[in-house]
Swiss-Prot record:
GO molecular function: zinc ion binding
Name this protein carries in UniProt: TNF receptor-associated factor family protein DDB_G0273435/DDB_G0273505
Cellular component, GO, one term: cytoplasm
Domain MATH: 252-380
Highest taxon listed in the record's lineage: Eukaryota
Places the protein is found: Cytoplasm
S-S pairs: none
Assigned keywords, A-Z: Coiled coil, Cytoplasm, Metal-binding, Repeat, Zinc, Zinc-finger
Domain remarks: The MATH/TRAF domain binds to receptor cytoplasmic domains.
Length: 409
């Protein structure tokens, strides 16, 4: 903590004559010229050695040898009251902040502060943790409380008697200590023996490799897996039932897709339409019903170049979905909105699109692209979901029929 005597002054009503006219601080070891003008000893010496050998106040010629100590003035200064430096918070700022709750309450004279006796005995001095500097600094009267909780405090293992940092002792006992009493790793299979950790290998060798216990554990895991699978199936069924109820209650999603730096995205897309697709962040209607939007600029419909806004379904069940896209214009009355209702297959990635004429969107006078960003408002509403397993079975059956027909031909 950095401070000057001026920072610690208890009373602010101090005679201006006690301040040095060069450094503007309280005079430290005041000395005077033959005419009686006083400055700090250090300031007067610096004036003579680096500026000019004269008093900066009356301009009388002086040398270091002709300067006189002003004992009376210095005694008056030394009797001024100051705070103990440990009255303040230990902060990294240049400004001292009085710590009224935990700081030292002692008021000293400047002379008492300079002789250092109080500072050597003060219980409010800041000290570093002796076990690790990362802990920071604490007042001397609080350091014991810190050490009772310090993660780096050396703690002796009850079993092996070695010292460990407090934060590492638990792991030592749990994983490493050779003298800790442990149970057999095949306890779940029926082996209830206990022994010091360092005898584990010996125990395993004497028990015919614990084959029967291992078999018991495997059987237990298989039984648990079967039970867990049954519970998971029930949870999935409940989840699907809840989602169906949500959808039947007009569950839908409204949002906006803002494509910033649109021109840069579009240039990358033109370089490689397959790897540089413009794709939205994921959209979740429910925790398991995910969608995404993407933009394609190379679609041709009836000989007209179009921008396609594509809705992709990222979950595995057939769905009938009503969706709309609105490419917004700076003038709301000129925004273009289109709507579709489509059936999406059970496959993940099943998609449908809506097209918008490129010439209208890219015409700068039409003001669809403003500040190099394109905004697309969208609405997605799931109207119905077909049973997932039924849809997959129907799909597999149709696929097998197609293969058979091709083989017959």
């Amino acid at each position: 903590m950095k401070y000057s005597i001026d920072d610690l002054i208890f009373s602010k009503d101090i005679d201006e004559d006690l301040y040095c006219q060069l450094c503007c601080n309280l005079m430290n070891e005041s000395v005077s010229c033959p005419n009686g003008h006083c400055l700090c000893k250090g300031c007067f010496h610096k004036q003579i050695e680096t500026v000019k050998s004269e008093c900066p106040i009356c301009c009388i010629p002086v040398t270091i040898q002709t300067l006189c100590k002003n004992i009376y003035l210095q005694k008056h200064i030394n009797n001024l009251k100051v705070y103990c430096p440990n009255s303040f918070l230990n902060n990294d700022n240049n400004k001292l902040i009085l710590d009224e709750k935990k700081g030292c309450k002692e008021i000293l004279t400047i002379e008492q502060l300079k002789n250092g006796k109080h500072l050597k005995e003060c219980k409010f001095t800041f000290v570093s943790c002796e076990y690790n500097e990362k802990c920071g600094k604490y007042r001397m009267n609080e350091i014991e409380n810190h050490q009772d909780q310090c993660n780096y405090y050396p703690t002796k293992c009850f079993y092996c008697k070695n010292d460990f940092e407090r934060m590492n002792l638990s792991n030592h006992l749990l994983l490493d200590c050779p003298l800790v009493i442990i149970g057999c790793r095949y306890k779940d299979g029926g082996c209830n023996e206990t022994f010091p950790r360092h005898e584990l290998s010996k125990h395993l060798a004497l028990e015919d490799n614990h084959q029967q216990y291992i078999s018991n554990i495997i059987n237990g895991h298989q039984s648990l897996l079967k039970s867990t699978s049954k519970q998971l199936k029930q949870l999935r069924s409940s989840c699907e039932e809840l989602e169906t109820k949500l959808i039947n209650n007009d569950y839908s999603f409204n949002g906006r897709w803002i494509i910033k730096q649109f021109s840069a995205h579009f240039d990358l897309f033109k370089e490689n339409p397959f790897t540089n697709l413009i794709i939205s962040p994921p959209i979740f209607l429910t925790p398991t019903k995910e969608f995404s939007l993407s933009l394609s600029a190379d679609t041709v419909v009836n000989s007209v170049n179009c921008i396609s806004v594509i809705l992709s379904k990222q979950f595995q069940s057939s769905s009938t979905i009503k969706f709309s896209f609105e490419i917004t214009n700076q003038s709301q009355t000129k925004s273009i909105k289109k709507e579709e209702k489509k059936k999406f297959s059970h496959l993940i990635g099943s998609s449908h699109s809506i097209e918008f004429p490129t010439s209208e969107i890219y015409n700068i006078h039409n003001k669809f692209i403003v500040n190099d960003q394109l905004i697309i408002k969208f609405n997605i509403k799931i109207l119905s979901i077909q049973d997932e397993q039924q849809e997959i079975e129907e799909s597999e059956e149709n696929f097998n029929n197609t293969l058979i027909t091709e083989l017959e031909e």
